[in-house]
Amino acid sequence: MAAAEGDGGVRAEADRELEELLESALDDFDKAKPSPAPPPTTTAPDASGPQKRSPGDTAKDALFASQEKFFQELFDSELASQATAEFEKAMKELAEEEPHLVEQFQKLSEAAGRVGSDATSQQEFTSCLKETLSGLAKNATDLQNSGMSEEELTKAMEGLGMDEGDGEGTILPIMQSIMQNLLSRDVLYPSLKEITEKYPEWLRAHRDSLPPEQFEKYQEQHSVMGKICEQFEAETPTDSEATQKARFEVVLDLMQQLQDLGHPPKELAGEMPPGLNFDLDALNLSGPPGANGEQCLIM
């Protein structure tokens, strides 16, 4: 009889602890850290053997396991299925129209997964990115030559989930985003700044050995690089979107000028990041003569 009463007391204690644990979990549901473990039962564990888990610990494990399962089912069901279906539909439509471009995106994705801190993997990723950008540029040219209206192009981009903003400048926004990343301060500034600082000494050392025309080109290169660095140095965290866009257009124009001047000296070009000397002409960013800035950027 005493044993039965003891068992009933243990069960009652476990039920009370479980109830307190559930109430605490509901109160702290949004907190990152779990609630403190409930106080141990009155039965002390045997110090000579492994400690037994209390009913409260077991209940807590079951609670967190059920929460994890709940969120996993949530993200693995309707939301994920819908997003996956939309993406697969968009990629299928793109594959029918531009199979080569889809293949390049797949290669780019694989290269991004392999990229590391070594120069070889970075070079592989950059090379793949260049091919993808060239494909995007060619695709943009084909679309422009096809006579398709901007409204039709915008609708096509929206079908691929690539629309941005209020409808203005939505033609190939992914290309603009990639170019903004490639021409950002983080990518360009460190190497360009180092080359710019070393250029004057190099020019003095090679002034007499270079043909006058080539020497002038190198001088102009140095000047353009300095202007690009000045644009990056003028950046502030509080810059408005309009200011950032205007600066991007200036940097893009200066990079085109730099491209027109040819490659920098090999002694200095070695300071450039692997694969940074991509061909801006291949991206068709300059646009037709007389085109305004927005058309040039294919934004």
Swiss-Prot record:
Main location group: cytoplasm
BP GO terms, sorted: chaperone-mediated protein folding; peroxisome fission; peroxisome membrane biogenesis; peroxisome organization; protein import into peroxisome membrane; protein stabilization; protein targeting to peroxisome
Membrane topology of this protein: Lipid-anchor
Region feature Necessary for PEX19 function on peroxisome biogenesis, mapped onto this chain: 2-91
Residues with Cysteine methyl ester modification: 296
Covalently lipidated residues, kind S-farnesyl cysteine: 296
Residue numbers carrying Phosphoserine: 35, 54, 66
Segments of skewed composition (Acidic residues): 16-27
Region (Docking to the peroxisome membrane and binding to PEX3): 2-56
GO cellular component annotations of the record: cytoplasm; cytosol; membrane; nucleoplasm; nucleus; peroxisomal membrane; protein-containing complex
Keywords, sorted A to Z: Acetylation, Cytoplasm, Lipoprotein, Membrane, Methylation, Peroxisome, Peroxisome biogenesis, Phosphoprotein, Prenylation
Keyword NADP part of the UniProt annotation: no
Transmembrane segments: none
Propeptide section residues: 297-299
Example of a GO MF term: ATPase binding
Positions of post-translational Phosphothreonine modification: 236
Protein location: Cytoplasm; Peroxisome membrane
Region (Disordered): 1-63
Modified residues annotated as N-acetylalanine in this record: 2
Assembly mode: Interacts with a broad range of peroxisomal membrane proteins, including PEX3, PEX10, PEX11A, PEX11B, PEX12, PEX13, PEX14 and PEX16, PXMP2/PMP22, PXMP4/PMP24, SLC25A17/PMP34, ABCD1/ALDP, ABCD2/ALDRP, and ABCD3/PMP70. Also interacts with the tumor suppressor CDKN2A/p19ARF.
Family, per entry: Belongs to the peroxin-19 family.
Known role: Necessary for early peroxisomal biogenesis. Acts both as a cytosolic chaperone and as an import receptor for peroxisomal membrane proteins (PMPs). Binds and stabilizes newly synthesized PMPs in the cytoplasm by interacting with their hydrophobic membrane-spanning domains, and targets them to the peroxisome membrane by binding to the integral membrane protein PEX3. Excludes CDKN2A from the nucleus and prevents its interaction with MDM2, which results in active degradation of TP53.
Name under which the protein is recorded: Peroxisomal biogenesis factor 19
Species assigned in the record: Bos taurus
Lineage start: Eukaryota, Metazoa, Chordata, Craniata, Vertebrata
UniProt gene name: PEX19
